[in-house]
Amino acid sequence: MTALMTALVPLANRAKEHSMQVVGVVVTYNRADVLGRSLDILAHQSRPLDHLIVVDNGNDPAVKTLLENAGATANNGTGMAVTYMPSQHNLGGAGGFALGMLHALALGADWVWCADDDGHPDGPDVLRTLLDCVKRYHLDQVSPVVCTIDAPDTLAFPLRRGLVWRRTRDELFDDDDPQHQNMLLPGIASLMNGALFSAHCLDTIGVPDLRLFMRGDEVELHRRLERSGLKFGTCLATAYLHPNGADEFKPILGGRMHAQYPDSPAKRYYTYRNRGFLMAMPGKRSLLLQEYARFTWFFLVQQRDLAGFREWRRLRKLGRAEKLYRMP
């Protein structure tokens, strides 16, 4: 606790450089090899962060060193307040962001900017651009476009608008806006990957659900955001770079629909369990028949995988019954 409190002193004592206090929150787990680049870019934004929190689910001393170095060299050497929060218990992405967000609010944050450990903002002006978008469109929450880290014109995750799947950044703009004047995609946001939340937004929708651990906790938070009546969206003028995750969305029916099939048993466990939980929630129940149709077709018709279908059903039943056990 002493080390944590010492880290908080610089934020409490120094004069405010901006009218709004923006606190960054990063959650990491055993990725010190790639975390350093993310922290370096976060620490050198043209609109500087006022404080940076790292929640370390791996309790790795190397992460603390990376954070301290980022804080010391931030903003052309003027420095930045940092807080390292090691966890003896793996909280998952959901619990890690919940802890970090609550701590940011306790510090007095007006805005909380989230980032993960294997991605990073696309340059030094991302935070400034997001805040400009907030002001222009009067937003309570805004996210950048999430693009593939080694192919920035490609979306890291496909996005469906109506019946059409969008896979490139340019496809997010409206057809009647060839000059790209409108910089907001309203009502849609990728949460955690560069997502910026106002304190008012978090007071209204809460923080991620610890029980979900990972895989879908951001979708459940998005559900709350949709139902809150708050104004939010994606700022098309800036991006967050992330490893491509499109491969786990398997096309079915000639590409008209997709079924999510992650590449590891752990990812499948939490994805399908959490989707069972999510589909039982207000605002998502209308999608249940579509969910059954997609996965029945994928497992039984396309893959001919009866065992996989049974496991999908078992896991979604666990989630629907709120038996949100950790994977054995």
What are these regions (language model features)?
Residues 31-45:
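Short, well-formed alpha-helical segments that are part of the catalytic scaffolds
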Residues 56-67, 89, 119-120:
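A conserved acidic beta->alpha catalytic loop
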Residues 87-107:
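Glycine-rich, basic loop-to-helix element that forms the pyrophosphate-binding segment
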Residues 109-118:
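Short beta-strand-to-loop acidic/aromatic patch adjacent to the donor-nucleotide binding site
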Residues 124-158:
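Conserved donor NDP-sugar-binding/catalytic core segment of glycosyltransferases
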Residues 177-197:
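A recurrent flexible, glycine/aromatic-enriched loop bordering the glycosyltransferase active site
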Residues 195, 201-206, 211-238:
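A short, conserved alpha-helix in the catalytic core of glycosyltransferases
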Residues 279-328:
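Non-catalytic, C-terminal membrane-associated alpha-helical segments of glycosyltransferases
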